[in-house]
Amino acid sequence: MDQKGTNENGLIIDIFPDARKSIDVFSNLKSANYLPYVMAAIWAKENRLNDALILNQHDRICDSTIANIFWIKDKKIFTPPLNEGCVAGVMRKKILELATVNSDHLVQEAILTQEILLQADEVFLTNAVTGIRWVKECRDKIYKKTIGSKIFTALDQTI
């Protein structure tokens, strides 16, 4: 971790191609849909990745094996809505709450396709254990780390 609390080297991730997470009333509970996460984590390790992204039944990205995903494009912050099948994570909720009181960090919920991911300026993953983790690379795309660090600082001040 660097002095701002985010990971210094950045994560290397990719999209797990072999399973889709269904969207249903249990989608937001990780324990009810754990098999795609386990398979994706094994695949990530076999491919020397830090994490893998999970696709939903519509081939859109919903989250990673252990975290919610956020992306930044043109200084706007986005995350998939819960109806895309992502886990209702504690840190995701905190960042959305922070966004309601801090206009510098407004977050919009939007679908995340593979194309949108590869056009993003920044990507970060969040969970309650590891906090905010900057994604450095997905496939051949290299991401910046500026706004994500500011969000970590703002979040750290609320704790």
Give, region by region, the residue ranges found by the protein language model.
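Helix-start/capping segments and mature chain N-termini
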Residues: 1-159
